[in-house]
């Protein structure tokens, strides 16, 4: 199964990992085999509410990896083009956390969905203190930029 996931990722990102593709590759449900019943109600509801308000919202990262492997994820993260303030207004129980990386925790019972805004590649707007320490880098961007700046290819998968 792991080899299947590796082959799928290689087909998505191609062989040249240095090239950034601005257009997402959409894989049909019949091809990726993710069982939607394995996605938590809280993650589905978080995405649905944002999408109903006109925002893009996707389950992202390790949860997508686990879903591809047929394993029920323990944690669900959502990436969106809504700002933290917009997410907070849209969701009933949502709390903005963090200073440097502003995220929103959306609470459903005992489950927390971590919701982040797509981040930009361009760091020219990053504010630093006198010692060069980054004070704030909440520079929002497009989905392709968010995918390109993630630390591992697997974290750049959106569902």
Language-model segment annotations:
Residues 1-159:
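Catalytic cores of the polymerase beta-like nucleotidyltransferase superfamily
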